[in-house]
Amino acid sequence: MTTRDCIHAFNESEFSRLLGMEILEARDGYSRVTMDCAGKMNPGGVAHGGAIAALADQAFGIAENCAGVHRVAVSISIHYIVPATGRLVAIAERVQDNGTTDTCRVMVYEGDRTVAEFTGVAFRVS
C-alpha cells in the first residue's frame, strides 16, 4: 500500500468518518491526525477519554502502516494530562524499530496544550 492509498483508506474508513477524523500528514513512522471534540463529550462537558484514545490510536495505526508494511497493535497505554473541549491534533512518531516490533509515541494537543501522551507497540506481520 502506498502512502497515498493508506491516507485514502484511513480517511474513508467508517471509524474515521464516525468520529470526524482527518489525516493532516502521513509518512512511514509519522502522522498528524485531527478531530473536533464536538459531539464526543462526557457528562462532565469535556472530551471523552475514549474519543481521545481513539484519535491517538488512529494516528499510531497510520504512522505504523503507511509504508506498505502491515503492523498490528500489541499494546497501548495512555496518560491523560488536561481536559479538552475543542479541536485536537495527534502527532505520532515511531521512536524504536527492532525489526519485529516498533514503539510509537503519540502526543495529543489542543492548541499548544498537551492533552494526552500515548505509547503503542506494534508487531510487524508482513
Q: Regions from the language model: what does each represent?
A:
Residues P83-R87, V95-S126:
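HotDog/MaoC-like acyl-thioester-processing domains
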Residues T34-D36, I91, R105:
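Beta-strand residues in well-ordered beta-sheet regions across diverse protein folds
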Residues R27-D36, V46-A47, N65, Y109-E110:
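N-terminal short leaders/motifs
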Residues M35-C37, Y80, R124:
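Hydrophobic residues in beta-strands and at strand termini
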Residues R17-L19, G29-S31, H70-I76, G86-L88, ...:
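A generic structural signal for short beta-strands and their flanking turns/coil linkers
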Residues M1-R32, A38:
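Non-catalytic linker/capping segments at the edges of enzyme domains
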Residues G61-V89, R94-V95:
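Hydrophobic beta-strand-centered segment that forms part of the acyl-chain substrate-binding groove
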Residues T34-A59:
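Hot-dog-fold acyl-thioester-processing enzymes
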